[in-house]
């Protein structure tokens, strides 16, 4: 059977080794004679799984001891509201850096739950002759001005990634749904990190939250119990029944990451994959990318065909070649190749080979 490479932005492809293991033990997990989906989340077997998952994640990301690791319901949008409700209180203010579609969505959700006066924004993207780049101004001010600064370091829709550290006098909250564990970061620089699982961690329905102790002392608003960080900490992420199968798969992905060399090794592979694709695009007169080199995402490579009339044929022929889910987001059009941790370099090589052949056949 030929290999299909899935370039979907999310839910994204999972490591083949993880999928095969899940398949092999779907009906009999850990010798229990039942599926991991069928056992109690409070059983000793499942608790052992969750403990191992947290230990592995802490090791992979070098998470300090003064941070809690939570496994919560929902995706990034759920955390948009959870952050506001957990940290702003009735009169708190927050600063949101806007670099693309997802950071804009975070602002929209925050303003639904607060007064406009509580949410300030700062646009980071500047456009120079059709090329988008991120410009981060110096951030100064009294620490009491904002409860937190929120930003999204990787914008999946726009193909923009912020690699430089944000120097903020306020606690930093980061939406790392699409680039968590794709490269090394210093967790101690953040007040909170959240990530929907469906790109680099596992299937949809689960979110990872990494929160520093002192953030839990901020005033909160009344909210749903299942999105209350303090309750999640108190009850070990099990105040109510968690998405157990998603948690199990995340645990297997963490094992796979460790066996693959960890985040540092993954970062090297990811850089090679992205460079291979961007170099081909830049050397072509048939494809183009509209993001400045210093802000091109390593996870989501957007590109456009010189003639949009070829888009439908490109997608159809790519699918027949085993290269699926390459259509760009409806808001920006074009194409998008999402090359998260689970995408092997062979998938990118095959994509480049296909793109080259398609261009030769249709150019001119």
UniProtKB/Swiss-Prot annotation:
Protein's GO biological process: L-serine biosynthetic process; pyridoxine biosynthetic process
Protein name: Phosphoserine aminotransferase
Gene3D superfamilies: Aspartate Aminotransferase, domain 1, Type I PLP-dependent aspartate aminotransferase-like (Major domain)
Record field: catalytic activity: O-phospho-L-serine + 2-oxoglutarate = 3-phosphooxypyruvate + L-glutamate; 4-(phosphooxy)-L-threonine + 2-oxoglutarate = (R)-3-hydroxy-2-oxo-4-phosphooxybutanoate + L-glutamate
Residues reported in the UniProt entry to bind pyridoxal 5'-phosphate: 76-77, 102, 156, 175, 198, 240-241
Function comment: Catalyzes the reversible conversion of 3-phosphohydroxypyruvate to phosphoserine and of 3-hydroxy-2-oxo-4-phosphonooxybutanoate to phosphohydroxythreonine.
Family annotation (SUPFAM superfamilies): PLP-dependent transferases (SSF53383)
Subcellular location, principal: cytoplasm
Binding of L-glutamate, residues: 42
